[in-house]
Amino acid sequence: AEGRFRGQIVPIEVTNEDGTTSVFDKDEGIRSDTSMEKLAGLKPSFKPDGLITAGNSSQISDGAPAVLIMERETAGRLGLRPRARFVSFAVAGADPIFMLTAPIPATAKVLRKAGLTLDQVDLVEINEAFASVPLAWQRETGADMSKVNVNGGAVAIGHPLGASGARLTTVLLNELERTGGRFGLQT
């Protein structure tokens, strides 16, 4: 409603199936007309008695990212001012039986490498394909959820295949700048 993503999306004119044109300038998955009652009425997606529904999993959406990453020296030589600096990276795997829990060991690993604690992190963007991902992560880390996916995650705004990482980076960077935060964590 506030238009926080407006500066992060390049408007593109598209031709619709019926031949008309429209401007694609906002995330297509946002459902402002949803309610808790509508979500509670959705049928399970995978098993008749399952818990995963279209309401607690991300939809596949369109997206094509572009980010420019370079060394500080290169930016200086080109006359560009860096907006952020990557402090550390980490990769971790998890048992596929407990699907989508890899952000838990990855968080511990990257914070250890960066010499930071979770309390020092201002904002967190978790790439959650299902609502259970940040919930499991929070249970293990004890993180303050008021810092997590503060403008909505993939369940709320979409999961563009091949664009998720760049979308998370862009959202995190812009929100850190907007709020004056210093450290962000992206999974």
Language-model segments: residues:
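N-terminal extracellular/periplasmic Venus flytrap/periplasmic-binding protein-like
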Residues: A1-R77, E140-K147
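Generic structural signal for well-ordered, non-membrane alpha-helical segments
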Residues: F5, S32-S35, S57-S61, P96, ...
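Structured core elements
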Residues: P11, Q59, V67-I69, R85, ...
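Active-site pocket-lining segment
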Residues: V14-E17, V87-A156
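Condensing-enzyme catalytic core mediating Claisen C-C bond formation in acyl metabolism
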Residues: M36-T101, P105, R112-A114, T170-V171, ...
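Internal helix-turn-beta structural module
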Residues: L118, R139-E140, D144-N149, A154-T187
